[in-house]
């Protein structure tokens, strides 16, 4: 989260009103820009669960934003299957507590991304 303030979801859908120095404002700006420019679906994804209260708050914020903008979320943070892995799998799939290895992306995350994207599109 890089210590960027979380911010709050606004009532506006006007790009000029978003505080892009906050997580909420930056996400809302991206969604608004994509809607105005390309008029295509927007999909965000969350990281698999790790020990971070600030990231947990950001995931909650993203769900608030989802309600406002009707975007899609591939939510690994709250995905029991993704987060319920053995220590052996954790060593194979993660470089550290946050960043997946190549195997982590390919074997652990990719099947979830494929399934959700098929549901969405």
Please provide the spans of the model-predicted regions.
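Oxyanion-hole/transition-state-stabilizing segment in secreted/luminal serine hydrolases
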Residues: 1-21
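Conserved acidic
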Residues: 15, 19-22, 54, 104-105
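A short alpha-helix capping/helix-coil boundary motif
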Residues: 9-11, 39-43, 88
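Active-site segments of SGNH/GDSL-like serine hydrolases
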Residues: 1-5, 27-61
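Residue-level detector of functional hotspots within protein domains
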Residues: 13, 28, 91
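Amphipathic, non-transmembrane alpha-helical secondary structure
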Residues: 21-28, 32, 110-114, 118
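Catalytic His-Asp segment of secreted/periplasmic serine-dependent ester chemistry enzymes
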Residues: 5, 49-121
């Amino acid at each position: 989260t890089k210590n960027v303030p979380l911010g709050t979801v606004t009532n506006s859908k006007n790009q000029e009103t978003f505080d892009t120095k906050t997580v909420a404002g930056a996400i809302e700006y991206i969604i608004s820009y994509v809607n105005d420019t390309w008029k295509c679906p927007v999909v965000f994804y969350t990281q698999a669960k790790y020990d971070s209260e600030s990231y947990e708050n950001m995931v909650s914020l993203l769900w608030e934003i989802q309600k406002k903008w009707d975007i899609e979320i591939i939510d690994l943070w709250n995905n029991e299957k993704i987060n319920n892995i053995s220590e052996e799998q954790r060593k194979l799939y993660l470089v550290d507590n946050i960043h997946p290895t190549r195997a982590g992306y390919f074997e652990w995350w990719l099947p979830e991304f494929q399934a959700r994207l098929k549901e969405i599109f």
